Amino acid sequence: LLIKDADLEWVFIDGTHIKAHQHSSGGNENAQAISKSVAGRATKIHLAVDAHGNPLTFILSDGTTHDVKVAPDLVDKVDLSNTEVLCADKGYDSDALRAHIEQARTRDNIPRKRNTKSSNDHMDWHLYKVRHLVENAFAKLKNYRAVATRFDKLKQSYENTVALACAYIWLKL
């Protein structure tokens, strides 16, 4: 975790794509977290923020990894003992993730996808609108050039860069 005194009443999670510079590849493939797709090389940052939009923790994955695959690991990195609600977008709609969140004695606020048979009666739509805090955190992170475009060959080096940018966001408090 990046900070111990966070407001953990609500936790918001999301992921964003980061373009990788053409010279950032070439290291050991297991230590890179860069994938190739039609859009080019990319890495994905999965971020958890507190009720004020301050970064709590993050995980890097290759750019083609689906959000719901990384979500249980991201949720495990956050201390949810004092958290009432964990909020995420439709990309995290999974019964396995909902069960994982319930095991932590936290309520989920994740809308169901359109093709699901369950309803969205459980949703707190006013709280869901506050989810923009995690999007704003990504915007703040991407203000740093080294985060917005990945230049590092190794995953560990880029992780350190993102952690430093998260620390700068906390310092502004």
Q: What do the PLM-derived regions correspond to, one by one?
A:
Residues 1-113, 126, 165-166:
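Polybasic low-complexity intrinsically disordered regions
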Residues 7, 28, 122, 145-148:
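A generic, residue-level signal for flexible/boundary positions that often mark functional hotspots
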Residues 117-123:
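Short, charged, surface-exposed secondary-structure boundary motifs
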Residues 99-100, 104-106, 124-173:
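Basic, amphipathic alpha-helical segments enriched in Lys/Arg and hydrophobic/aromatic residues
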Residues 115-116, 156:
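Positions that flank functional sites
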